[in-house]
Every structure is written in structure tokens, then in C-alpha cells.
């Protein structure tokens, strides 16, 4: 599918148009204007050129979110090379494997990651460059080392009469050219490299421009890892082409850091995973109304509306009080928290997608979102549910269109397993679609639990209810010997703060189990529970690695 516009042209135009505006800020650290970004892009181009990098070569980036991470990304993509973003949470052997599998010729790396890497395990690299100052601790090329030592001098010779907007002219891409190889967080073995062409990036960015409405000078806080396409697309790529001021928290945000930074920055759009929203609402908002008086007043006409408005204002303030909408994605959203947000008319929306679609498949503006859905299929995409009755009987959701990947890098067999002969991507998610086109995700196909009586059980639906019960931090539902077992990581700090002993906590969890079973049909009731002392291990997008918890001991 050919798109008339050019993604590289959008980057170039944004830099030229917003030359004197703030572009990138490390929270409590450096700020770069768009003109500073342009200068650093040119300097990185000098390093790439002297390292012998050619168009189409792979360049890996591994580090925490930062201004220099995004500058490096922009430099690589405007040079015509292929970006290989690597999640900073990956272990050293995973980083080594991805660098080698992708055939990356350079690795840009954060200092905390670099400390744990072994350059000998990545023998094909021309060099390793530090993100913080673009130093070159490892160079297998004399020209690269010389270029770094004389970078300002070379830049001065290249632009002797002051660097100006007119000096910027990036080569435009071809729609099907490979832009990114994004290695999925993957829960088994080494992850697969998703090949995203410029077509996919451009289509995703254009969709955001059409639906979200950021303007030059708006502020956006980047919380999601830029190595994952959700944060990369919604925060960074869309934001930069719109001329926004992008702030990086540079570390995993706690509710305290979020409240502090959002109050100062007052972002216009917030993209985050459900876990962040759920924690804030369960800790700061729901306790104020989750009592007999609160529930009573919420059902009294006139008073109810005023209370809802007060709650909404309080919730808005937690996120800075200036945003158009909060875009939630990356994992299932707690149904009871969502129902509460809907009740107070809070401006949230659900986005659904996959790395393989860069990532957008479904999304609707918050004013159009139907409760429990993830919106409608995005522009330039089509989707269907493989079911005899898609509105009533869940089936696998498949999609195709402009956002779709080229395939998995050097893995044709894996590509054939997910993209059929008609070009449909099999998402692995069970869903229904109503008559208005709203998509409802029921759970992962691979997570579906099938009992001996033939009943299909979606564990995510039960977990959503259980996670909202007293002192439950997170949970997993598994099937053992044809019985459902609830694995629970309790909120022990909260329980002990309320004077509960360990035996009290066990008693409360049993009460939770009995109360939950009253809300469930007989075939999906929990037979027993098991408490876990530590939170469940997760992927980068905060999905629990379920495969680790399928074989539990008494």
C-alpha cells in the first residue's frame, strides 16, 4: 500500500518549523531544542559515515528513555539505516543475541547497560558508542575513533557558515523500505525481530495526527519504554512530528514521581499501560468512595453528579489536569476500574495493537469509546473475527492493512505461522465485534482454559474481578487437575498497615474467593488459592509471563 506522504519528510519539516522550540528534556536534566536535535543528528551522521555505515545497515540502540536515545534513533533513520531498538531490561545474553541476529554494525548503549555487556560476544560490531556523550569505548575502525576525537572540527568544516534549517535535507524513503527491526518482549526463548517498513510507521503516525490532535509546543511525558512500539509511536514518533516538547522520566515511574512530574509538566496526552492507571486509582481515588457512605451518595440524584465531578477533578489533577485523553494499552485493563472511569466521565481510551502492526490495530477517541471495548479498527486497517457469529461468539481476531509488518527477520517459518496466504495477520487474541464495529478483546488464544466438560474460560476476565478485591495486588488463574486455582500476589504493605497478620491475610483471601465465586458461573469458580511472596515476573509491556506459573506446587 503506497502512502503519498513521507515519514522522513515529516521529521525534516518538524525540525525546520519548530527550530527554536524545546524538543526533548530529560526530567531534572538537559533540554534540547529542535535546532539542537538537528545538530546532533548531523554529528551522528558523521560518526556513521566514518564507521562505513551504508543505507540499510542495522544500528542497535539499548538504553533507558532519554533525549540522546531519541536523537540517536532520528539520526539512524534519517541516515537511511535500520534502527534496532533493544529494551534496556533485557539481560546481557539477550542483548548479545539480538545484536548478532540483527547483524547490527554499531551499538549505541546506555552506561548502566554497557557495564554488563561483553564486546567479545558481539564480534561483528564496528564499534560501541555511549548514548550519554557519544563517546566510543570500543572501535574496530580507526576512522570511527578519529571522527569521534575530531567531531566538532569535522562538523565545522562541513558547515562553515553556521548550521541553519536550510542545511537540512534528508533523503526520503521508499514506502516498503525496512525502517525498524523491533525484537518483541517474547516470553519463550529469544524474541523474534519484527520488520516494520516506513509504510507502517507513517500510517501509524498519520493515524495519531488524524485522531489525537497534539499541537506544536504541547508537552508529552514519555513513561513507556521507547524500545517498545507503543511508547515509540504514541509518545516519540507522533510527538516529534507534531512539534511537541517530549519529557523523559528516565526511570520506571512511581506514583509519586508521576504526580510530581505531571504537576510540573502538565502533559496534553498520556500513553501508559493499565498497571499505572490501576495503581493510581486503587491507591488514591477508589478508597475515597469505596465505602458505605460513598456508595450511597453516588446513587442519590443531584448529589451523585456533584460527587462524580469532584472525583473526576481529583483524578484529572493527579495526571496534571491538562490532558486531552489518556491512552491505555499494552495489556488488559481492569474491568471495574474502567467502569468507574466511565461513570465519572474520565477522558480515557483503550488502544489495541501489536508490535507486528507498529502497533495500532484498534482505537477510538475517548468520547466515542464503548465500555469494555478497545475501539474500532483504525484507518487503513481491516479486521475480522474468525467465528460463525462474530458479535456473539468469540473467535480469533485477524487483521491486515498499511500498518502490517514485512515479517520476522530471518524467520520465514514464523512469518508463515502468523500471516496467512491472504495477508491476514493472526493476532492470537480472542475477540468479538459488535454491529457498530467496536472490538472487544476476550483474552489470548493461548491463555484460554478448556475444562473437561468443554467449557471455555478466559482467565483474564476472572483476574480482572479478583484484582479489585481487598488486598489483592495482582493475580493469575490457572487450571490444575481440571480445577481453577487463583495465584495471588497480595498487597502485604497495605494489609499490615491495617493491622492484619499473615493468618488474617489468608482469611481475607479465602473470603475474597468465596465472594468472587458468587459472581461467577459454576464452571469458572475458583477451587483454591495460593499466595505468592513476590510480584509475578513480567514482560517490558507489563504482561505477566504466564508460562512460568503453570506448574505450581502445593
Language-model segments: what does each one mean?
Residues 449, 474-476, 482, 513-554:
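Conserved C-terminal "lid"/linker of ANL adenylate-forming enzymes
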Residues 3, 22-52, 57-66, 70-74, ...:
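Conserved AMP-binding/adenylate-forming core of the ANL superfamily
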Residues 90, 107, 401, 406-407, ...:
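AMP-binding/adenylate-forming catalytic core of the ANL superfamily
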Residues 202-219, 226-313, 322:
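Conserved AMP-binding/adenylation subdomain of ANL enzymes
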Residues 19, 149-183, 190, 213-219:
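Conserved pre-ATP/AMP-binding loop-to-beta segment of ANL
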Residues 10, 51, 78-156, 482:
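Structural core segment of the AMP-binding/adenylate-forming
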Residues 377, 384, 391-451:
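Conserved ATP-binding/catalytic segment of the ANL
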Residues 268-271, 281-369, 473:
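Gly/Ser/Thr-rich phosphate-binding loop
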